[in-house]
Every structure is written in structure tokens, then in C-alpha cells.
């Protein structure tokens, strides 16, 4: 049963990613089912893997919630690495290049992109190992830091996202102070939320950035649906019919958010044991 719940939760995280991605891109790029299900398939893979690695008891709503957030992070990281360093695509359709760029100009050498991508992934892995060891030290009793200080470390993904976003966007759009600090601030908030449901520092770190992406993308995509995303600024809408067709996916998206909120409520009601307890 745990495996089945992990599959469903992973699928939900993947479809959530797929839907906001489709909603913002389809008027400019059109729609294909293989592209839409790409994130869903990643979620189906990562959901069970995260469950197995952390040995989560999915009979508890709190663990389903953190599984969703952690899976979300894994899916996003995989897709961003793929799009930035691996995928070959014409960048002229974008106002802001989506693949690795320097001062707003795409890096033409595929080999150079792969090398930079390797070191990027290496840094992420090293950060993950450091957080994993921090978690071991905490549970062994050798780390007696204030929980709110630990949450600063758990929000490290927000800083990685902020610097990566500034590197990509600032040469084209200019540097925005609020935009730069938004991800770290929201990441700290969700690290706090995740810490109410689990005392695993690594899971808190993963949920921190996972839920940050989920909420920020929901805000940008669905609260301002007529405003083109930065990467398509000034670009023509080539598939205007999808401004209407995409709305058919809204019930699924809303249902997934309801699922997440219900798991959070049940987790609180059932008395989840977290890093932070009131």
C-alpha cells in the first residue's frame, strides 16, 4: 500500500508541475501530450524512490505531505538540469535564453554546457551530502543548534534558485532586489512549515524548495494569466486557441492543491512530530 501511495503522490507532484508549465507555455509553443506527461513520468519515478530512501510511513498524512514536496524538488531539479545543460533547442523563440547563457547569450558549445552542468550537479550533490550529515549529527545528539538556525540551512535551495535566476534573467531584464530575495524568503517559510511535519533535516530542505516552486509558479501563472512570462516577453502568441483550451486543466490543478492542503490539515490534527513543535 505504501508503494501505491508513493506512486499516486509522485504522480500528483508531476502533474502539478506539468499543468502550470503547460498553462504558461502552450499559447506560445502549442501543446503535446508527451511534453505534458514528461514531468508526470518523472514524478512517478521519484515518488517511490524518495519514499524508499527515507523509509516513510505513508499511513501518516504528514509523511505524504513531505513526500509531495520532496518529489516536487527532485522533478524540478531534473527538468531544469535537462533544459539548461542537456537539451538542444533553438533559443531564438525566447526573450530570455533557457539553456546555459553568459550575460544573456546562449553558450554555443555543447561540450562546455555539459562540463558546467556536471559541476552544477556536483555542487548540488555536495550540498545534499552536507545536509544529510547535518541530519545525522542532529539525530545523534551532537548538533544542538536552535531549530530556527537550522531552518536557515534548510532554505539553501532558495539561495541556489535566486543566484541561478539572477544569472539567467538579470542580463536581459535587469536585477530586481525583491525578485532576488523572494525565493530565499519563501524557502525559509516553507522550511518552517515542513519542520512542523518532520524532523528530518534533509526532507525539510527538499520540501523547502519544492513548495517554494509550487507556490511561486502558481502565483505567477494563475494570478496573472494574461501577462506573458519573462522568457516570452515581446514574443507573439502563435497558438491563441490554447488561451482557452488550457483552462480545461484547471480542475486537476485545483484538486491537487486541495489534496496537499488536506494532507497538511490531517497532519496537524493527528499531531505530527516535527523539528519544531508548539
Residue ranges of predicted features:
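Alpha-helical transmembrane-segment detector that highlights a single hydrophobic TM helix
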Residues: 52-81, 201-218
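Generic multipass alpha-helical transmembrane bundles of integral membrane proteins
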Residues: 98-174
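Final/C-terminal transmembrane alpha-helix of multipass membrane proteins
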Residues: 113-130, 247-271
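Membrane-helix interface and helix-disruption motif detector
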Residues: 1-5, 25-33, 54-67, 132-152, ...
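Interfacial loop-to-transmembrane junctions
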Residues: 104-115, 229-258
Amino acid at each position: 500500500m505504501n508503494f501505491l501511495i508513493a506512486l499516486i503522490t509522485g504522480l500528483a507532484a508531476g502533474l502539478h508541475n506539468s499543468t502550470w508549465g503547460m498553462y504558461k507555455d502552450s499559447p506560445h509553443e502549442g501543446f503535446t501530450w508527451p511534453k505534458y506527461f514528461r514531468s508526470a513520468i518523472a514524478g512517478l519515478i521519484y515518488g517511490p524512490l524518495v519514499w524508499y530512501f527515507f523509509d516513510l510511513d505513508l499511513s501518516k498524512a504528514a509523511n505524504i505531505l513531505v513526500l509531495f514536496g520532496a518529489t516536487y524538488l527532485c522533478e524540478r531539479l531534473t527538468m531544469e538540469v535537462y533544459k539548461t545543460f542537456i537539451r538542444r533547442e533553438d533559443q531564438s523563440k525566447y526573450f530570455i535564453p533557457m539553456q546555459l547563457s553568459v550575460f544573456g547569450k546562449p553558450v554555443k558549445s555543447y561540450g562546455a554546457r555539459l562540463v558546467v552542468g556536471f559541476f552544477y550537479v556536483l555542487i548540488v550533490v555536495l550540498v545534499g551530502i552536507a545536509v544529510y550529515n547535518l541530519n545525522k549529527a542532529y539525530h545523534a545528539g551532537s548538533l544542538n543548534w536552535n531549530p530556527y538556525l537550522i531552518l536557515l540551512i534548510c532554505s539553501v535551495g532558495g539561495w541556489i534558485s535566486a543566484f541561478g535566476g539572477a544569472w539567467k534573467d538579470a542580463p536581459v531584464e535587469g536585477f530586481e532586489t525583491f525578485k532576488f530575495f523572494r525565493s530565499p524568503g519563501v524557502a525559509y517559510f516553507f522550511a518552517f512549515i515542513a519542520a512542523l511535519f518532520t524532523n528530518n533535516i534533509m526532507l525539510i530542505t527538499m520540501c523547502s524548495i519544492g513548495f517554494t516552486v509550487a507556490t511561486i509558479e502558481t502565483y505567477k501563472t494563475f494570478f496573472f494569466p494574461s501577462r506573458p512570462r519573462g522568457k516570452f516577453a515581446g514574443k507573439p502568441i502563435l497558438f491563441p486557441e490554447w488561451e482557452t483550451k488550457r483552462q480545461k486543466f484547471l480542475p486537476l490543478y485545483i484538486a491537487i492543491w486541495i489534496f496537499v492542503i488536506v494532507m497538511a490539515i490531517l497532519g496537524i490534527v493527528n499531531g505530527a512530530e516535527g523539528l519544531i513543535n508548539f
